[in-house]
């Protein structure tokens, strides 16, 4: 039994990893070796012989056992890039009864440089909300270059479903040291193009460029408690075909198909729209649709809408209840994440239109507040 490397997975949101790196940086003297030895003892104690990932929590120079996953994990490539070891091949060979091809000393001798893996998820990180962003990927251009690898889960034209994991792909980068790996990862993410759905790339870049990350001062709660994502905006429209083309704005319209309502977003020319007002036509410019809101139906309308497709997992209010503006009324699950849908005004619950387990579409009214 050998241990290959440590990894750090502290950059998380909702206890789900965003960025992983190997080896774990800023560990105290002897900590990495002690972790490796503890991992080997754990595997031997239960008679486990295959690829496994042992997780620890590290704080103030001490580490504590969390769990053991009897498999490789999503971030295993970041270990591969600093060792040159194909961990999947090793897993298969061990499962077929072969012996490990290297000793502990040989594994240690192969380690070189630093690796970073960034998960590209179909989520909108605007305002730090990380709302699911299902839809069709109209264009995907992967980064490349020396020390850069991209493991893709989707291609241009594929649709990211609301029912499954929204991992679009993984950017894995190697550098001769941690600062080089960080700089190379930033360059790779800035080169990557994903259109059609929002992704976590803006949040990933904010993390990598932050001085706390460079100084290893971040923790598992750092993204949610310290990282400022207020400046992150929803995806921009595609560039016009030529310089003389009219600028585009995002418009949203609601359509109904077989009794189901859907919000359809379109990028259209920014031209005046004629609306009736006081018996006379009046020109009004369209406005860009707001993104990431927890409740729709207009400000203070009382019609609480869900912003995306999903499943209602919990109803938090009943008819007759008094609620405050911003209070959660239902919990919506989409893409394996729970989202609290909130009241847009204070009042009394007049109607609850859904129950736990119901499937809803974007724009559906779930609660009416009078």
Language model regions located:
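ATP-dependent carboxylate activation and anion-phosphoryl transfer catalytic cores
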Residues: 1-240, 282, 287-288
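Residue-level structural signal for beta-strand termini and adjacent loop
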Residues: 6-7, 69, 267, 318, ...
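Residue-level marker for the onset of beta-strands and adjacent loop->beta junctions
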Residues: 52, 169, 250-251, 300, ...
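Short, solvent-exposed loop/turn motifs
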Residues: 99, 261-263, 328, 336
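Flexible, low-complexity "carrier/transfer arms" centered on conserved reactive residues
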Residues: 138-140, 187, 199-325
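Glycine-centered loop/turn motifs
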Residues: 156-158, 250, 363
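Structured functional modules or segments
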Residues: 288-370
């Amino acid at each position: 039994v050998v241990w290959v490397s440590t990894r750090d997975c502290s950059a998380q949101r909702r206890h789900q990893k965003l960025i992983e790196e190997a080896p774990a940086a800023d560990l105290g003297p002897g900590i990495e070796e002690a972790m490796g030895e503890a991992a080997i003892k754990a595997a031997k104690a239960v008679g486990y012989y295959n690829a496994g990932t042992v997780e620890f929590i590290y704080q103030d120079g001490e580490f504590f056992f969390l769990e053991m996953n009897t498999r490789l994990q999503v971030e295993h490539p970041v270990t591969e890039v600093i060792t040159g070891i194909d961990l999947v091949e090793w897993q298969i060979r061990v499962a077929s009864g072969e012996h490990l091809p290297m000793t502990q000393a040989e594994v240690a001798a192969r380690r070189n440089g630093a690796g970073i893996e960034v998960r590209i998820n179909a989520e909108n990180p605007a305002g730090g909300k990380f709302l699911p962003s299902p839809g069709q990927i109209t264009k995907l251009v992967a980064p490349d270059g020396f020390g850069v690898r991209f493991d893709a889960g989707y291609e241009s034209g594929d649709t990211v479903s609301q029912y499954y994991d929204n991992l679009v792909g993984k950017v894995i980068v190697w550098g001769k040291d941690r600062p080089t790996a960080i700089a190379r990862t930033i360059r790779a993410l800035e080169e990557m193009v994903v259109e059609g759905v929002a992704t976590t790339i803006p949040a990933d870049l904010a993390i990598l460029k932050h001085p706390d990350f460079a100084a290893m001062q971040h923790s598992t709660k750092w993204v949610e408690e310290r990282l400022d994502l207020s400046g992150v905006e929803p995806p921009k429209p595609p560039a016009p075909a030529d310089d003389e083309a009219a600028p585009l704005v995002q418009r949203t319209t609601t359509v109904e198909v077989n009794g189901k309502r859907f919000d359809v977003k379109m990028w259209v020319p920014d031209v005046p729209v004629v609306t009736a007002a006081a018996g006379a036509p009046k020109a009004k410019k369209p406005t860009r649709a707001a993104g990431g809101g927890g409740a729709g139906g207009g400000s203070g309308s009382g019609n609480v809408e869900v912003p995306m497709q999903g499943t209602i997992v919990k109803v938090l209010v009943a008819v007759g209840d008094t609620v405050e503006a911003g209070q959660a009324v239902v919990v919506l699950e989409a893409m394996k994440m729970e989202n609290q849908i909130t009241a847009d005004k204070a009042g009394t619950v007049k109607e609850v239109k859904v129950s736990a387990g119901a499937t809803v579409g974007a724009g559906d009214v779930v609660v009416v507040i009078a």
